Amino acid sequence: MDNLVFSLNATVPIFLMMVLGLFFNKIGWMDEEFANKMNKFVFRIPLPVLLFGDLAVVDIEEAWDTKFVIFCFIITLISITIAIGISCLLKDRSIQGEFIQAAYRSSAALLGIAFIQNIYGNSGQAPLMIIGSVPLYNIMAVVVLSFFKPGQNGMDKALLKKTLTGIITNPIIIGIAAGLLWSALKLPMPVILHKAVSSIGGVATPMGLMAMGATFDIKKAFGMIKPTVIAAFIKLVGFVAVFMPLAVVIGFRREKLIAILVMLGSATTVSSYVMAKNMGHEGVVSSSVVMLTTMCSAFTLTGWLFIMKCFGLV
């Protein structure tokens, strides 16, 4: 019951922020133009700062576990490949990029540390899970959203150049790279800078969620119900069912298993919607999957956690 309450405390406020954005839109306080500008702002400033802050304070040398980081990286890559393969079965190819990203991209950076701290009292292996998965999440998101952009026909030199440029100049990837470099160089984080980073990064999630809620089109969402449900099932159940037994066989236990669970089975991150909108996609599938996985993840995560506890794995 405690785990269910914790999961609900982590996910219900996120869902309510989206509903609040939708409410503000309906009463005329937050129109679509304003919400789109808010999206761009979150994408360019608060979200990169949030990821920088998460990674800059990690002591990589002390926490490092090569096998664990490589495992997180490889299963993330395989998950993306599976999502791409399943997306080829979709009739509407214009939503393929959004479907792929929504099916694999977790709230790892936001929920990982908090979830493990709630269970074990310390962040454990969450920072290493973030290092092994989050940079790849974002690099592949740029590639997928560029290649499967509506109206795009195949890969050519121009698109390849544009995609590589997009990776290098993507604000989120710059934030991750800066955070990893800061951590690797063991640079101190002055109190003033830490507070500034925390304050700026702290607005990323609420602003992004409200902007998403304000632009959420219920009629369009119901029109995309089938790909939304499929992507949500893959995100919350499919990947965990496939890869968690493998993690157990390899020998991962306790904090590492919880970190892998969050990486594979947490709700689709709001940044997937922010990035999709800012890279020329409609955003309907992204926002729908974020909403559905957010509503359901408290129960699916708790269910997975209960199963692992029954087997004495955590």
Name each region found by the language model.
Residues 1-314:
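Alpha-helical transmembrane segments of multi-pass small-molecule/ion transporters
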